[in-house]
Amino acid sequence: MSSIEQVNEVFDTILVLDFGSQYSHLITRRLREFNIYAEMLPCTQKIADLHFKPKGVIMSGGPYSVYAEDAPHVDHAIFDLGVPILGICYGMQELAWINGKQVARGEKREYGPATLNVLDKEDALFKNVDHSTVWMSHGDKLHGLPTGFKVIATSDNSPYCGIVHESKQIYGIQFHPEVTHSSNGKTLLKNFAVDLCHAKQNWTMKNFIGTEVQRIRDLVGPTAEVIGAVSGGVDSTVASKLMTEAIGDRFHAILVDNGVLRLNEAATVKKTLVDGLGINLTVVDAADEFLDNLKGVTDPEKKRKIIGNTFIHVFEREAEKIKPKDGKAIEFLLQGTLYPDVIESISFKGPSQTIKTHHNVGGLLENMKLKLIEPLRELFKDEVRELGELLGISHELVWRHPFPGPGIAIRVLGEVTREQVEIARKADHIYIEEIRKAGLYDKISQAFACLLPVKSVGVMGDQRTYEQVIALRAIETTDFMTADWYPFEHSFLRKVASRIVNEVDGVARVTYDITSKPPATVEWE
């Protein structure tokens, strides 16, 4: 075990073993809502390789059949840990398969709500859960009780809705308590973690700050220095502030102005980070370099790669100018990785298919021989926002809408020129300004304007015009995996469109995108 304590060694941890369910991450989120630290690992995790002992284990659902030849299976060593275990859906079927192969294909798939009937009213898992609505989503079923188990809950269509081992705290449930459709599902998960596993409810961002600051100091040491890229977004700002709290001016933040940032972004970020938060920041104006490299490029993937490669080149060049006080080279690179990024990479079947190339600084590690430091890698976005406010970062910045790494370059459809960027930038500024004036900014998850690669006939004064088209986008979402368009009042859209056409030269028409995700993505490119 490392001498530097990890989060799962400091806080009581519920281990969630992922069998591939689309709901698996929700188990972790629900437990954290009760201030219980939960961590997800692939179901194939070797228990001998764990560097911590969990207080309990939850086996998630999954899209497979336990009896299939290529079905994933858990390391049987989890049963030697001596901690409570809860199998959900596929996880329950895994328990049944291990203990007598009591699983078969159902006559029909059961998907939707069911009413839970608890037989053992004294069982701690089902305290305050009886006769509630639960959510079913399974095609296989138990055709008999696993060896050593008894039934403790049923539903109209499932005689084995809940089972428990006769002498051990090993539970199986056929439904999904982690989804909101299960009315008392969160209560059941809390019962498991608190009443059965006796996990302490001390996972708070206030406690995390002290733990993480000390961990950073132990990791970096008394003299080493750290560099990191900042964008003005919440993730990089919170990570930078946390690093500054830990090691002061031995952290060097670099903001690369790539020419496709929001209006007045570089100046705003500098004022916020340096004057407001005391972060050691260098601003690099590389707009010409980026825009020159983007000349003639229309393919969105090529844009992303050009911006990513140019960023690495500029960042490396600026980092070489930093001379650490101890005379040694920079050792560490800060990155604002969040827990959803970690979750996406842990699947035993491999990460999900790439839809878009993500703009990050991964290439810097290999090129500059840096060690990666990720202080936010255990946190969900809502936890990062809470952490940011505790660190004294303004509400406005903490709740700022996401902005893509490639910036306005992927909001100018087609070739990116200085003129096109300026049109999109000004239109976006007007749009966001009006959203704020209307008191809607915090109700909307993300909003932006993009410039379409088409022209449209218009009339300005007595003159016929033939100019460009702006598309407005605004969405509501909880996780950015799915999203719906925001239903503005027509009067609001009329006002925004009027301002853009009258105040931004080169625009003849404004449209509003009413496509949900899926089928569309949030960004146009």
UniProtKB/Swiss-Prot annotation:
It is found in: Cytoplasm, Cytosol. Signal peptide: none annotated. SUPFAM superfamilies: Adenine nucleotide alpha hydrolases-like (SSF52402), Class I glutamine amidotransferase-like (SSF52317), GMP synthetase C-terminal dimerisation domain (SSF54810). Residues 13-202 form the Glutamine amidotransferase type-1 domain. Its EC number is 6.3.5.2. ATP binds at S231, G232, G233, V234, D235, S236, T237. GO terms for biological process: GMP biosynthetic process. Keywords: ATP-binding, Cytoplasm, Glutamine amidotransferase, GMP biosynthesis, Ligase, Magnesium, Nucleotide-binding, Purine biosynthesis. InterPro entries: Class_I_gatase-like, GATASE, GMP_synth_C, GMP_synth_GATase, GMP_synthase, GMPS_ATP_PPase_dom, NAD/GMP_synthase, Rossmann-like_a/b/a_fold. GO terms for molecular function: ATP binding; GMP synthase (glutamine-hydrolyzing) activity; GMP synthase activity. XMP binds at R304, D462, K517, E523. One of its GO terms (cellular component) is cytosol. The active site is at C89 (nucleophile), H176, E178. Pathway: Purine metabolism; GMP biosynthesis; GMP from XMP (L-Gln route): step 1/1. Its cofactor is Mg(2+). NCBIfam families: guaA_Cterm, guaA_Nterm, PRK00074.1. HAMAP family: GMP_synthase. Homodimer. PANTHER family: GMP SYNTHASE [GLUTAMINE-HYDROLYZING], GMP SYNTHASE-RELATED. This is GMP synthase [glutamine-hydrolyzing]. The lineage of its organism: Eukaryota, Fungi, Dikarya, Ascomycota, Saccharomycotina. The gene is GUA1.
